[in-house]
């Protein structure tokens, strides 16, 4: 079975085409600037890159171009579209209804529309991508894989906010959590690497990129996560503030004469390590500036490392212990310095980092803790696309 995995943004589209027989990525690519001038498709096969610049007025045009690239006589990997067994779609928000991935039908589409109010930036392009694929491949099964689904096992006492309860019942205001597909993948992978049943493990997974979240996984289930009703809650991120005193918001609105859109923009796009450092939202730039003596850049990193460290400690308390910690995503996988700083002062939990292991190599799964470290620490590259493909494969196989 060969599965196309689609991840639609507002003006972009990422894809992978995976042969599930051996889980090989046959092709992958990125479409940028959809609906704008200079729209471009970068298509990769066996590390060979092909760039196609062609006008794409919408996501349907973009997906048609992706299908053309996959079936191209020179650069393609299949002869025709009948070789695409099914399509797996990343969907950011499934609300409370979906705790698992699901075959897309009319009822599912209706539910996705209802979730737009919970994810106004993310769900609309996800829906547009699904509709475009359905128009181009009407007889191909489609599966929705939700970022929020993995966190539906979080207990009620952990997901309820201390607000009037009727706000939860009427508006669905509660913790949902995000990056669920990534947290699910690396928690399963670390259990495999440790040679243990995931049901016997207490795992803390740290998805650290421009967007970042921490997850507590107990017996294979998410029991707590740092992102909340939106991806704004939690640790300081690239441009997002993370959790702050809510009373700051009306104070800022009054003092700076901000409206709600201004405030939303400030919290989501001008805060985080970018807001503190004044340098960049890219951690590589901030690390470089800190090394050159920029005090605000160093402060931004100190704040970030402290926030992550604090969540690791609190999640160990939430689970009554921890067996392993996993670092993943851009920063988690590539910054040995950040991993080392985060793990400082966590010796009381039984975490001991091996400097040599932490600094050697990247791009593969590895243990970075000392052999006698009570809590094992891993770096594991995430693979959300493979997780989406696996879910899609399982659901579609059961249809037959």
Swiss-Prot record:
Mg(2+). Can also accept Mn(2+). Keywords: ATP-binding, Cytoplasm, Kinase, Magnesium, Metal-binding, Nucleotide-binding, Transferase. Gene3D superfamilies: 3.30.420.40. Pathway: Metabolic intermediate biosynthesis; acetyl-CoA biosynthesis; acetyl-CoA from acetate: step 1/2. Substrate binds at residue 90. One of its GO terms (cellular component) is cytoplasm. The active site is at residue 147. CDD domains: ASKHA_NBD_AcK_PK (cd24010). ATP binds at residues 14, 207-211, 282-284, 330-334. Its EC number is 2.7.2.1. One of its GO terms (biological process) is acetyl-CoA biosynthetic process. It catalyses: acetate + ATP = acetyl phosphate + ADP. Its cofactor is Mg(2+); Mn(2+). Its main location: cytoplasm. It is found in: Cytoplasm. InterPro entries: Ac/propionate_kinase (IPR004372), Aliphatic_acid_kin_short-chain (IPR000890), Aliphatic_acid_kinase_CS (IPR023865), ATPase_NBD (IPR043129). Belongs to the acetokinase family. Catalyzes the formation of acetyl phosphate from acetate and ATP. Can also catalyze the reverse reaction. Homodimer. This is Acetate kinase. The gene is ackA.
